[in-house]
């Protein structure tokens, strides 16, 4: 019986840009879920809801930039609209993503308007408009954001699942893995911004559910078991993912130690990002038709490598600082 087919090694198609996109858009979408869960009827947005919306807003800005960089030619986006392919998840994503960004931006502005101080800088006085403090409008944008967030999770998972070329992609376990891992990061960032000293059982549950989902994926079929084992062969990324998961889980039990809070948040971010790297990039190195592994050289100085990753996270920091300054201007007390 012929067990191998001699073929040329295949170069990977998805580059690190798509990992950044899946990470930030996943965190943004699940942060919306978190915000809506913290929402209370006929009341101003709580601190937890505001923090979750802030996380979603930052992610909704950074994620499209990473996706545009992955396309290399921004003008290619127009083809999704001029030649709409209803069967393609990417075509639907071209519609859902802009709607999601608009919804989250509106949600963020409305939560900001509900908690502003009377004396605002001239360029921010429009936040005091009575319309922006309407509970009905706020709930409308909560629902708008929630629906588009569900669409984001659905299309990003389906985009990977529909390829059907690899056992680790074409699996129902992909949805809970992407959902729970991103939600853990979103919840962890929200709690960190609120500076909560209470132990988060929800965060621990999400981390455990992610681990169980990964185990379910690994043992879903013989091919998946083989491919999953190859991910640990000669690569440190899969081990880094596991280490970050352990650190994040341990730190979640020590919420009153601020140093451990910092470590826990960094571990959560590392876990969520590395998990997507392993599932998206590392999985592509596993050959589909022979026992060899496809080559992939990571270049730290390349735009499609380390430089691109650092630039996207740098953009996230820049957006965080800028939005943080706006929040401080709108909520500062009158002297």
Please place each PLM-identified region on the residue numbering.
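Extramembrane terminal tails and long inter-domain/linker segments of multi-pass membrane proteins
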Residues: 1-12, 81-84, 118-135, 285-335
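Hydrophobic alpha-helical transmembrane segments
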Residues: 23-33, 98-102, 182, 242-249, ...
């Amino acid at each position: 019986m012929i067990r191998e087919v001699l073929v040329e090694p295949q170069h990977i198609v998805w580059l690190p840009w798509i990992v950044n996109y899946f990470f930030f858009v996943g965190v943004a979408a699940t942060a919306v879920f978190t915000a809506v869960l913290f929402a209370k009827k006929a009341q101003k947005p709580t601190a937890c809801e505001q923090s979750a919306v802030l996380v979603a807003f930052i992610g909704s800005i950074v994620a499209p930039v990473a996706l545009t960089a992955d396309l290399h030619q921004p003008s290619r986006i127009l083809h999704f609209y001029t030649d709409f392919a209803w069967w393609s998840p990417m075509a639907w994503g071209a519609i859902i993503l802009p709607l999601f960004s608009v919804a989250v931006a509106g949600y963020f502005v409305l939560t900001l308007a509900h908690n502003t101080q009377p004396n605002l800088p001239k360029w921010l006085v429009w936040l005091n408009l009575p319309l922006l403090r309407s509970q009905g409008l706020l709930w409308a944008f909560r629902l708008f954001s929630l629906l588009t967030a569900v669409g984001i999770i659905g299309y990003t998972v389906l985009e990977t699942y529909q390829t059907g070329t690899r056992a680790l992609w074409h699996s129902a376990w992909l949805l809970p893995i992407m959902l729970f891992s991103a939600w853990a990061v979103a919840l962890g960032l929200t709690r960190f911004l609120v500076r909560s000293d209470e132990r988060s059982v929800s965060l621990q549950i999400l981390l455990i559910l992610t681990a169980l989902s990964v185990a379910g994926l690994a043992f879903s079929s013989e091919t998946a078991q083989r491919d999953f084992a190859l991910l640990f062969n000669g690569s440190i990324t899969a081990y880094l993912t596991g280490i970050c998961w352990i650190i994040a889980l341990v730190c979640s039990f020590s919420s009153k130690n601020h140093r451990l809070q910092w470590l826990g948040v960094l571990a959560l971010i590392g876990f969520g990002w590395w998990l997507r790297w392993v599932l998206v990039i590392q999985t592509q190195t596993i050959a589909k038709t022979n026992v060899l592994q496809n080559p992939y050289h990571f270049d730290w100085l390349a735009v499609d490598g380390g430089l691109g990753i650092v630039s996207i996270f740098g953009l996230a920091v820049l957006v965080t600082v800028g939005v943080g300054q706006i929040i401080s201007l709108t909520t500062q007390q009158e002297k």
